[in-house]
Amino acid sequence: MGNRINWQITIGTMLLWFIHLGMAAQGMPLTNEAAKLCQQKSYAAALKKADEAIHSDAESRDAYTWYVHGFVHKEIFKEEELGNRQSTHRRQAEESLLRAMKCENATRHEDMIKLALKYLASTYYNDALQSSQVIAGEDESVPRKLFADFRRLMNIAVPETNFLDYEKELEKSLGQHYFTLWQRDTEVGKWRDLATKRYASIVALDSTDSDAYYNLAVIDYNRAVFMYRKLGPDTDMFDAITLQEEASGLIRSKALVNMEKAYALAPEKGEIVRGIMMMHRALDHEKDVAYFKTEIERLINEGKIKADQPK
């Protein structure tokens, strides 16, 4: 689901730096002991020493002391509470790291403080994506609050961050959630409309996103298919003609239009080429169907799409 962030390599580098500075820190025995215990994964003992350090007049003015305190909480969160959106250790880690940024000597430790904040930001982002798949009804407040926390910390850790791709991933994840709910009960048009709204919001953010156009096309195409499925032997002839006209009109005026936009942006993407061919087939556009079948064969021969997928 979505595009999860994984910064384990970066965090590993930060840990080495953390240990080195802990050994080098002068006049801060409590902080150094906390760092050493954290390195040994003795987190309860490390936290006790770190708590003593931030309440020590001699050590609490130093950014490194607050960094170590935040780092210990971060490690406990990572090892014991990862995925817990209400984690007090994550919140405490954040508060201590932000406190470290306000100390007079924060500049000396700024890089490693920001790396720790960047890691915490990534967990908020991943939680936002996960929560978007299990929201109750149409209440998006939880994933959007988590995303806001991600943005807030990233603006501190990496001020030049471009959030466009992250915003699109959240909208996509919400769209997938609503689409899945609609597929479970196609009579509930609310889910279809919400899915459409989310993918349309991606287009508003980035008019070059081929996946968003593709998903909008799929929604309307499936809607037309579900309309066709209502036809049966007992359907009145006039009603059948009306329903067929509405379904084909939906494919022609909405689904195909968005699929053509997707194709213009990504003409060699397998699902898009196959999707546009299927829509032309539904509309009895024989020449277009023949053209796209040839395109699919070319893309298969060039190794750009898999041959085991249906043409």
Where are the regions a protein language model picked out?
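Bacterial Sec-dependent N-terminal signal peptides
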Residues: M1-Q39
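Alpha-solenoid helical repeat scaffolds
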Residues: A44, D51, R91, L98, ...
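Flexible helix-coil transition and linker loops at the boundaries of alpha-helical arrays
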Residues: A53-Y64, R99-L117, R151-E169, R184-D185, ...
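Short coil/linker segments at helix-helix boundaries
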Residues: V72-S141, I156, F179-K197, N222-N258
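Start-of-domain marker
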Residues: Q26-R91, L98, R108
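Terminal, low-structured helical/coil segments at or just beyond the last alpha-helical repeat
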Residues: P233-S253, V257, K261-K311
